[in-house]
Structures are given as structure tokens and as C-alpha cells.
Amino acid sequence: MISPSIPAMPHDVPDATTAQAGPRLVAIIPVGALDGAKSRLGAVLDAEERLDLTLHLARTTIAAAVAAGRVAEVLVITPDDTVRVLAANLGARPIRQRDSGLNQGLAAAREEAIAGGADAILILPIDLPDVSSDAIDEIAATLGEPQRPLVAIVPDRHGRGTNALLIAPPDAIGLCFGGSSSTAHEAAAAAAGARLIVLGGPLALDLDTPEDLLLAEPSLGRGRPADVA
């Protein structure tokens, strides 16, 4: 079973200043309260296993974003003290979420990114078992010196949710997470006159249902909860 303990600061986590030259891209990772996390997996995982899985996913996502060569800074927006400690230990900047709701929290983090000089933001949920620094850099590679706003979306495997969202400039469109957010973000991009790029790849799989968990087993590997067959 994945240990929920918070790791020490890894020695090989690159400093954000080592990101490649170019537009300043800030990754934003929202992490909700750990209480009741992944409740939709309650049929196959007990509360402790869901907590372990959530911490494992948060740790993996934050570390991948910090290691991505095209990401200048990683912000983790969360109401949870444990997650803020985890984020800081991994080299990200934790932000306390004061408003309830995913879009409200992301809006606050976006303001922080803009205040820090971000040219673009990349929003990454933590429930992506195939996340890696390479997958993040592949999305970031869509960011050049656009003559007009740019929106790049990785929809979920059903084509409904948004598993990754790059926006340049950071406030080019509103945030529409929840429900059929992929369609909503595409519509927002069209309304803003933004260039739209829809990507596939490993980040199309997210962990919402028991079926998703089975599909993710090869990626979770030895870190998966012990009772998941």
C-alpha cells in the first residue's frame, strides 16, 4: 500500500530557474481536500487506500511538473496542509485555497501566476496515472510566440472532461472545469478568437471509476494499493 508519509526534499529535483528559455509557463496543480478523496472508487478501495492513492498521484504529478524542462514554476493550490507540505518538499510553491470550488481555486492560482509574470499557464489535475515530465513538455511545446491567444486541451478518453489545459496568455479564456468541460473550453477558445489545439496521448486517461483504475494498473505499478487486483 502506498505510504501517505511526506518525503524529504529530493536532491535531484531541478530548480525552476533551469527551465528552457522562451515564454514563461507556469503549471497549476489543484489538489482538493484529502478527506473523502476519490470517493467514486469506494466500491473497490477503502478510505485508507483512496488516501494513499491520492497522495501517490499528487506526489507523482507535482514531481513530473517540477522536472519538466519547459515549465518555469509549479503552483499547487489546495486547502490541505499535508498537500502544501508535500508540494514545498518537491520544489513547488503551495498556495492555500480559501474559496471552495475547483474553478474558484484555479482562478486564484491563475492570478498568482499572472502576478509572477507568467506568459502562459498549464492546468494539470492530479488524477492522471500516466503523467510524466515528457508528457508535460509535449503539451508545453505547443507554446511558441503566438500572434493570437492559444488554447491547448487534452480531453479525457471519453472526450468530455479536460485532463490538461494550456492557456496563453493566462487569462485568454474563462475556466470551465466540471461536467463537459472539454467542449466548454473549446467553445471559450473559439469565442476568444484563440488558436485551438486538441491533443491526445498518455494524459487522456484519468482515474475516476473502477474501470479507469484497472486501465491504470500498468502505470501505477508497484505503487498501486495492494488490494487492487
Residue ranges and their predicted role:
Residues L34-R40, R84-L86, G161-T162:
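Short acidic/His/Gly/Ser-rich catalytic and metal-binding motifs that mark active-site loops
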